[in-house]
UniProtKB/Swiss-Prot annotation:
L-methionine binds at residues 437-439, 490, 605. This is 5-methyltetrahydropteroyltriglutamate--homocysteine methyltransferase. It catalyses: 5-methyltetrahydropteroyltri-L-glutamate + L-homocysteine = tetrahydropteroyltri-L-glutamate + L-methionine. It comes from the Bacteria. L-homocysteine binds at residues 437-439, 490, 605. 5-methyltetrahydropteroyltri-L-glutamate binds at residues 18-21, 114, 567, 611.
């Protein structure tokens, strides 16, 4: 037996029923005061801590809570505030904090992008002229709160300095170390205050260590953590990595810290190999992330216990920590909120609270022997077996179709240069055609009507009539705005992935399986629990109805396989590429149904393509090849004059531009406005032969852009892209915006387009 310690790395902020989201939005809407917001969120925070305490977690994280984002928290802790927000140098107010994230009338929001290869977004630090100083030791506040209110000796959590700076913008390789030298004493101040307050442990997250980087950068980590160790020798620092294995295992485990946190789930088996090959320092704790913190499936506890027993052979007794692979921020709170799920599926699930229980079971099994938790192990064993052996995961028709993929055509009949002429011939669009990305605002009335329908308070006929009325209203709005290619608005959809999950076999929606995407925006990823199959038309009815209302083309709107995969909780018993191809075959039937019913412009969105890239570049090519294959599997069977669109967002594209072209979509739209033109520079350096729309304004902020701002974005793009290839559109879908600001922004977009179009037509003459 091995003496082990249980630990957690972070807990979901949302609350079991999204109470955190509602509190934030009430504050933003002015219906509660700041004092009330602080009171409501404190209740949620303490409830989360108490649950972890009650479930037997020894090292409970504190300071993982945030009002928006942990990276933004780090920025305001150290006073890294963009000048446009006119910060006075004191402690950052909550209003300024939210302005940085959301923007305000006279200041655009800071850029937002994906947290490594997850669907969580962070606010990008703006590091130009950064002079860090501690304005607010949030970690100390949360540590003292947990101690005072609950008697919890918590483990404060910080985003590590190197990861923080690597995630920022405004510094280059030359200035990086100079900037790092400025941050070290600021971090030391935080750590000294924690040590003085009695903190025993602090968790410093450095997921950058799990990426691919130059080995010379290890010296930066040695410098930082030696400074910390010297400054706070009595504070146990857990240097936490996650999302991948360590390229420089030997160097990392010998850094001057008390504990090293390693992901043993998303490491492709590399970590245990490194441990066997190189051992582990006797004086350090190994925090083994063995419970999957990014997916919702129940752990095979027998396999996890076997792995932990193997790990324990290389770790000094009493120095093995059992924990999730990463923060539980990325999974829903509890499966106890899902009593209506199929019994076999429910049995196979493990949300945040259940993962804490798995950690406790494994810790007890190591410390007291497996027989001490024999009943718990048997229950888990039976549940995992029942799901794997169920008919859900053994659909012979689907498995036969996958086996015969070599017989399925995955290329369009004509090359782009030839088929685009056929598309232009019937579309007859002007220079710089305008469109939107898909969704329009889901007003309180839309959400209430859907909720009433789901509760059975209104009939299917009443609900469908409402959706048609709202669709017709927005078709008229788009025509009045003079948009060229229309959309139906997606009023029937809660989410661009969940909606498809409700219509395809092998998917299961949840009621309260919410996770944070950005700010108060929560998504409810469907569960892909079994083999995926087409069972009914998904989008045809709404698309055909919308097209019947107008002579302008209306886009059919689908979500592509890789985005569905990346924004779902995917079964973990088969490779993701197999699931993506199952989804591709199912969606191919939907694309064909749209085309059969007269929809000749079909958008197949792949916004999450880049975010799913493996952190190790050596693994990129297979992922990208698989992504291209599943996309073409979805789209390749259409006629040559049917125009395929796709959309991507939150992405750096310079390193995957060949993949984007290989998708062979006729038109791609890309989010660009929040990156302030950086993506445009990619197209200044490469030749892209298909049509493209670079988003001309940021939809994530309530701020309405000016005509001049939009024109500046258009003109900048036209320096890189041929005018005849260029489309004009917002960055992303408009579902989360309010109607007045949406219409105002689109009016500005159309006005800006017409003025620039007129300029170009004069030049052509």
């Amino acid at each position: 037996m091995v003496k082990a310690i249980s630990s957690n790395l972070g807990y979901p902020r949302l609350g079991e029923k999204r109470e955190w989201k509602r509190a934030l939005e009430k504050f933003w809407n002015g219906t509660i005061s700041e004092k009330e917001l602080l009171a409501e969120t404190k209740i949620l925070r303490l409830h989360a801590l108490k649950k972890q305490q009650d479930k037997g977690i020894d090292l409970i994280p504190v300071g993982d809570f945030s009002f928006y984002d942990q990276v933004l928290d780090t920025s305001v802790t150290f006073g890294i505030i963009p000048k446009r927000f006119q910060h006075d140098g004191g402690k950052v107010s909550l209003n300024t904090y939210f302005d940085i994230a959301r923007g305000k009338n006279d200041a655009v929001a800071s850029e937002m992008t994906k947290w490594f290869n997850t669907n969580y977004h962070y606010i990008v630090p703006e590091l130009a002229d950064a002079e860090p100083k501690v304005l607010d030791n949030r970690a100390l506040y949360y540590y003292e709160e947990a101690k005072k209110e609950l008697g919890i000796e918590g483990k404060p959590v910080l985003v590590g300095p190197i990861t923080y700076l690597k995630l920022g913008k405004g510094s280059d390789a030359k200035s990086f170390e100079v900037l790092l030298d400025k941050f070290i004493p600021a971090y030391v101040e935080i750590l000294k205050e924690l040590e003085a307050a009695g903190a025993k442990w602090v968790q410093i997250d450095e997921p950058y260590l799990a990426t691919s980087f130059d080995k010379k950068e290890i010296a930066l980590f040695e410098k930082v953590y030696q400074a910390f160790q010297t400054a706070v020798p009595n504070l146990k620092i857990e240097l936490q990595t996650y999302f991948e294995s360590l390229d420089y295992y030997e160097e990392v485990v010998n850094l001057p810290v008390a504990a090293i946190g390693i992901d043993f789930v998303h490491d492709h088996g590399d970590s245990i190999k490194a441990l066997k090959a190189h051992g582990f320092p006797e004086d350090k704790y190994l925090a083994a992330g063995v419970v999957d913190g990014r997916n919702v499936w129940r752990s095979d506890l027998d396999a996890k216990l076997e792995l932990l027993t193997e790990i324990a052979n290389y770790v000094a007794d009493g120095k093995l920590i059992v924990q999730p692979s990463n923060s539980l921020l990325h999974v829903p709170v509890t499966k106890l909120s899902e009593p209506d799920l199929d019994e076999v599926i429910l049995g196979g699930l493990s949300f945040a609270d259940q993962k804490l229980e798995e950690i406790t079971i494994l810790t007890k099994a190591l410390t007291n022997g497996a027989e001490s938790v024999a009943a718990e192990l048997e229950e888990s064993r039976a549940a995992v077996t029942a799901l794997n052996e169920s008919s859900h995961r053994n659909n012979l028709e689907v498995q036969e179709a996958i086996a015969n993929l070599k017989n399925v055509r995955v290329d369009r009949e004509l090359p782009f240069a030839e088929r685009i002429k056929l598309q232009h011939a019937w579309l007859k669009l002007p220079l710089f055609p305008t469109t939107t990305i898909g969704s329009f605002p889901q007003s309180p009335e839309v959400r209430k009507t859907r909720a009433d329908w789901l509760k059975g308070n209104i009939t299917d006929a009443e609900y469908n009539a409402f959706i048609e009325k709202e669709t017709a209203r927005w078709i008229k709005i788009q025509e009045d705005l003079d948009i060229d290619v229309l959309v139906h608005g997606e009023f029937e959809r809660t989410d661009m992935v969940e909606y498809f999950g409700q219509k395809l076999a092998g998917f299961q929606a949840t009621k309260f399986g919410w996770v944070q995407s950005y700010g108060s925006r929560a998504v409810r990823p469907p569960l892909i629990y079994g083999d995926v199959a087409f069972t009914e038309e998904i989008t045809v009815k709404e698309s055909v109805y919308a097209q019947s209302l107008t002579k302008r083309p209306v886009k059919g709107m689908l979500t592509a396989p890789v985005t569905i995969i990346n924004w779902s909780f995917v079964r973990d018993d088969v490779p993701e590429s197999v699931v993506a191809n199952q989804v591709g075959l199912a969606l191919r039937k939907e694309v064909e149904a749209l085309e059969r019913n007269g929809i000749k412009v079909i958008q197949v969105d792949e916004p999450a393509l880049r975010e799913g890239l493996p952190l190790k570049q050596a693994r990129w090519q297979k992922y990208l090849d698989d992504a291209v294959y599943s996309f073409k599997l979805t789209t390749a069977s259409v006629q040559n004059d049917t125009q395929i669109h796709t959309h991507m967002c939150y992405s750096d594209f310079d390193d995957i531009i060949d993949t984007i072209s290989a998708l062979d979509a006729d038109v791609i739209s890309i989010e660009t406005s929040r990156s302030h033109g950086e993506i445009i520079s990619t197209f200044e350096e490469v030749t892209y032969d298909k049509e493209i729309g670079l988003g001309v304004y940021d939809i994530h902020s309530p701020r309405v852009p000016t005509v001049t701002e939009i024109q500046d974005n258009i003109r900048r793009a036209l320096r890189a892209i041929d005018a005849k290839q260029f489309w004009i559109n917002p960055d992303c879908g408009l579902k989360t915006r309010k109607e007045p600001e949406t219409i105002a922004a689109l009016q500005d977009m159309i006005k800006a387009t017409k003025e620039v179009r007129a300029e170009y037509q004069v030049l052509e003459k």
